[in-house]
């Protein structure tokens, strides 16, 4: 059975058998074409109305200071805040802070060990130990 394809106004194709088209009388075909034309005209009108309403919406947003960049900035700010309060981010920041603190403590202790005061204290402790242990030094 042969098929005919017709394109509708929205760009989709519908398949009709040729016998189905032949079953329609000439007045029925004219009536359907008229309805189709009216429907397509309504669709065009609705598109124009929608475009006008979108323009008006944009104007109102601009007057209120709600531009696309403001909305984007607000979305990014909210997303960043959500990330900052997330458990993973907090744990990562805590871990990084503890690691940094540990590094600083090690550096400070290294600096203290090299200081003259610590060297003097170390020497004093060595002397006391040698006196207590009977003059034997455990290290050179």
Curated annotation (Swiss-Prot):
Keyword Coiled coil, does the record have it? yes
Q: How does it assemble?
A: Interacts with TPD52L2.
What is this protein's gene name?
TPD52L3
Origin: domain of life: Eukaryota
Which ranges of the sequence are coiled-coil?
28-57
UniProt lists the family membership as follows: Belongs to the TPD52 family.
InterPro entries, A to Z: TPD52
Specify whether Transit peptide is a keyword of the entry: no
Q: Name one Pfam family in it.
A: TPD52
On tissue specificity, the annotation reads: Specifically expressed in testis. Expressed at 5.6-fold higher levels in adult testis than in fetal testis.
This protein's GO CC annotations? cytoplasm
What protein name applies here?
A: Tumor protein D55
Signal peptide, first to last residue: none
UniProt region (Disordered), positions on chain: 1-28
Residue stretches of biased makeup (Polar residues): 7-18
Keyword line: Coiled coil
